[in-house]
Amino acid sequence: MNRRSFAALLPALAASLPALAESQASPGSGANKKLIETGVYPGFTPPGQFSGRAGHSFFHGMLPTEIGCEAHVSYLAVGAQHEPEEKHTHSEIWLVREGKVELRLNGESHMLGAGDVGIAVAGTMHWVRNAGDTVASYFVLEVGTGPIGH
């Protein structure tokens, strides 16, 4: 293949890159491009007995402005950690509903109680665990440019 033939293929190659990137995304990434619609989303009551964590996603997708958004409520059993310490390309905001949680942000621990809010902007190492002696629950709002994946 000479340079002229190769150059003729470049537009087709460039056009195929977005599809290739999407096909290479891990199947369990959870990225969701579904359009979020205006509305009311029903709540969730956790089972009477659970170990670790329980939760409910209210919505997960894209706002009309191309902003990825996901909202859920999580319930943590005493001592339970939500997930391993990690960072994301999106931001996460927590609003504690009940109980006491420890929110670690870039290695610094913060104790939050009912009504407290914490935020980890994109790129912040973080994790949450139940630091109290009763079930803890909190709402999470995740926002970022592009789809939110898990």
Model-derived features: positions:
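Aromatic/pi-system hotspot detector in well-structured domains
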Residues: 69-72, 117
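Short acidic-glycine-tyrosine-enriched beta hairpin
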Residues: 108-122
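A generic "binding-loop/recognition-motif" signal
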Residues: 80, 89-90, 108, 124, ...
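Histidine-centered metal-chelating micro-motifs
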Residues: 81-83, 87, 102, 118, ...
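Conserved short histidine dyad/triad with adjacent acidic residue
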Residues: 57, 72-88
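A short, N-terminal "cap"/entry segment at the start of jelly-roll beta-barrel domains
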Residues: 2-68, 83, 150
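Ligand-binding loop in jelly-roll beta-barrel domains
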Residues: 122-148
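Short, conserved beta-strand element in jelly-roll/cupin
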Residues: 75-76, 87-102
